[in-house]
C-alpha cells in the first residue's frame, strides 16, 4: 500500500509539473509583446519636435518619446538603405554580411533576419511600404524570402504632395491587424518611402511652412531660399511618416493593444542631401530613435545618452519575444539588447560601456571605374569622430563625369554644382563632392557639421592614434575583411542588376543607362582632376 501510495503521489506530481509547464508556456506565449517597427527612409536625427526642432512637427514620435524613451545617440553603422537595413535585420555590422555590405545587392541566404526568426518562433509577420532593399533576398533554393514578412500594399490614398507615395500605410497595417487571432503575437514592419526623394519643389511653403522657421542651415550648404525650400519639402515628407504612425498608434489604442506592443520608431540613415546620405559624417549616421513599451520599460519620458546602434535592435526584439537563440535562422549577433536600458531608471548615461559606435561603408551607388566603392571605417564618441578613407584617390560621392551618383539629385545638389561651374563658389562643392584625405578627425562636441579636419594637427595626433587603435581593435573582433587585408572582396561582389555592371565604362563609351535618382544636369561634361 505504501508503495502504491508513493507511485500515485509521484504520478500526480509529474502530471502537476507537466500541467504547470504547459500553463507557464501558455502564459509566456500570451505575455510576449506585439512588435511594431516604424522606419522612415532618409530621416535625420534632430528633425522631430521631441528634439526641439521648430520646422518639423512629429506628434506621434513625440508621444513615443514622452511615454517611453528618447535616444540622443542612436546610429546606423552604414548610411545607405540596403546595408543599413541589413544591419537592423541581422544584428550584425555591414562588413560582417558579405554581399549585403553593399547597396543594390543580393542578400546572402545564410544571414537570416529577426523577422524571419520571430516567424519561426510563433509570431505572425508582415510589412507595408519599404522593407529591406534595394536588392534581392532569396533562399538557398532561389525562392524570395519573407525577409520582413508578408507584404501588405493594397490600400492607396492620394497624398498632399506629388512626391509622396500613394501607399496608405496605416490602412495596410489595419488589414494585417484584422487577420490576427486574439492572443497571437505579431510583428509588423511599417516602412515609409518618405522622406526619400523626389520631392514636389515648394510643397513645404505651399502647405503652410515658412522659410524663416528653419533656425539653422548646416554650414556645408549655402544658406538661401533654394536650400531652405528643399529642407521644408523634406519636412513635409517626415511629417507624412509621422501622420501614418499616429494613425497606427490610434488604431492599436482603440483595440486595447497599444500597451502590449513594443513600438520602435527610427530612420535608416540621414537625410538625402549632399554630404549626408551615403557618407560617414555625424549627420550621415545619426538617426532619431524613440521606443515605447509600458510593460517592458521602467518609467517614461526618459532621455538616453548611451551610444546605441542598429546592431542592437535585433537582439532586443528577440529578447522581448522570449527567443533565447538566434540560430539556426540567424548568425551570431554583434549587437547587445537594449534591455539594460529598459530595466534601468532615470535619464542620461545608463551603461558606461555604451560609449562609442563604429561607422563605415563599402560600395554604394554605381559610377566609378571598375565598379569600385569608396571604403571608409570610422569610430564616433561623445567628443570625436575619426574616419579612415582607404581609397582617397577616388571620388567620395562618385565620379563627376558620371553624375556623382552616390548623391541623389536635388535642387540643392544642382545649385552646388552650378556654383562651381560658374566660378561663383567651390566651398560647398569641395565639402560635398571633392576628394578627401586618408584620415579625418572632427571634434564633434564643438563641430557637429564636421567642418574642421584636425587629423593633420600635431596637437591632435595622440587623439587620432588612440581612436584609430580602438577602432581597429573593435573591427578585428568583427573579423572585418578590411582589417585582414581582404577588403577588395567587397568590390568583387555582384550587383543584382546587369545594368549596373561596368556602368562607368559603358557610360564613357557612349551608352546611357537609366539613372533616375539624379538629374541629367548632374553629369559633368568632362572628367575633373
What is each PLM-predicted segment?
Residues 7-18:
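Bacterial N-terminal signal peptides
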Amino acid at each position: 500500500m505504501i508503495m502504491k501510495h508513493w507511485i500515485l503521489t509521484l504520478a500526480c506530481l509529474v502530471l502537476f509539473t507537466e500541467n504547470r509547464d504547459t500553463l507557464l508556456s501558455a502564459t509566456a506565449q500570451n505575455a510576449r509583446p506585439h512588435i511594431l517597427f516604424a522606419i522612415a527612409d532618409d530621416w535625420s536625427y534632430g528633425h522631430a519636435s521631441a528634439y526641439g526642432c521648430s520646422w518639423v512637427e512629429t506628434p506621434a514620435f513625440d508621444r513615443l518619446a514622452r511615454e517611453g524613451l528618447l535616444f540622443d545617440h542612436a546610429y546606423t553603422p552604414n548610411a545607405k538603405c540596403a546595408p543599413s537595413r541589413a544591419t537592423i535585420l541581422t544584428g550584425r555590422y555591414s562588413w560582417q554580411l558579405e554581399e549585403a555590405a553593399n547597396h543594390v545587392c543580393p542578400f546572402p541566404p545564410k544571414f537570416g533576419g529577426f523577422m524571419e526568426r520571430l516567424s519561426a518562433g510563433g509570431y505572425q509577420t508582415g510589412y507595408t511600404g519599404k522593407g529591406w532593399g534595394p536588392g534581392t533576398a532569396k533562399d538557398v533554393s532561389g525562392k524570395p524570402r519573407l525577409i520582413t514578412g508578408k507584404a501588405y500594399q493594397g490600400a492607396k490614398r492620394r497624398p498632399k504632395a506629388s512626391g509622396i507615395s500613394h501607399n496608405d500605410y496605416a490602412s495596410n497595417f489595419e488589414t494585417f491587424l484584422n487577420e490576427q487571432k486574439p492572443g497571437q503575437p505579431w510583428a509588423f514592419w511599417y516602412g515609409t518611402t518618405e522622406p526619400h526623394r523626389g520631392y514636389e519643389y515648394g510643397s513645404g511653403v505651399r502647405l503652410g511652412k515658412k522659410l524663416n522657421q528653419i533656425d539653422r542651415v548646416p554650414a556645408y550648404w549655402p544658406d538661401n531660399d533654394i536650400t531652405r525650400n528643399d529642407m521644408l519639402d523634406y519636412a513635409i515628407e517626415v511629417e507624412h511618416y509621422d501622420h501614418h504612425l499616429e494613425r497606427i498608434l490610434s488604431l492599436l489604442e482603440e483595440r486595447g493593444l497599444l500597451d502590449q506592443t513594443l513600438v520602435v520608431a527610427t530612420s535608416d540613415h540621414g537625410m538625402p542631401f549632399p554630404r549626408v546620405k551615403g557618407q560617414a559624417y555625424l549627420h550621415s549616421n545619426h538617426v532619431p530613435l524613440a521606443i515605447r513599451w509600458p510593460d517592458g520599460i521602467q518609467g517614461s519620458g526618459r532621455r538616453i545618452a548611451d551610444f546605441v546602434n542598429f546592431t542592437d535592435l535585433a537582439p532586443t526584439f528577440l529578447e522581448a519575444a522570449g527567443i533565447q537563440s538566434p540560430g539556426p535562422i540567424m548568425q551570431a549577433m554583434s549587437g547587445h539588447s537594449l534591455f539594460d536600458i529598459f530595466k534601468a531608471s532615470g535619464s542620461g548615461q545608463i551603461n558606461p560601456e555604451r560609449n562609442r559606435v563604429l561607422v563605415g561603408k563599402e560600395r554604394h551607388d554605381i559610377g566609378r571605374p571598375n565598379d569600385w566603392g569608396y571604403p571608409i571605417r570610422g569610430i564616433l564618441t561623445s567628443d570625436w569622430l575619426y574616419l579612415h578613407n582607404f581609397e582617397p584617390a577616388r571620388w567620395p560621392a562618385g565620379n563627376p563625369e558620371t553624375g556623382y551618383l552616390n548623391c541623389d539629385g536635388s535642387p540643392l545638389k544642382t545649385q552646388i554644382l552650378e556654383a562651381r561651374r560658374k566660378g561663383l563658389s567651390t566651398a560647398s562643392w569641395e565639402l560635398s563632392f571633392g576628394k578627401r584625405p586618408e584620415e579625418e578627425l572632427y571634434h564633434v562636441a564643438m563641430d557637429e557639421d564636421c567642418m574642421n579636419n584636425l587629423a593633420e594637427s600635431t596637437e591632435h595626433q595622440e587623439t587620432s592614434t588612440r581612436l584609430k587603435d580602438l577602432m581597429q581593435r573593435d573591427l578585428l573582433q568583427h573579423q572585418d575583411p578590411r582589417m585582414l587585408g581582404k577588403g577588395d572582396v567587397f568590390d568583387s561582389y555582384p550587383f543584382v542588376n546587369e545594368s549596373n555592371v561596368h556602368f562607368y565604362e559603358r557610360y564613357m563609351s557612349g551608352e546611357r543607362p537609366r539613372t533616375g535618382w539624379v538629374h541629367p544636369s548632374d553629369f559633368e561634361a568632362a572628367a575633373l582632376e
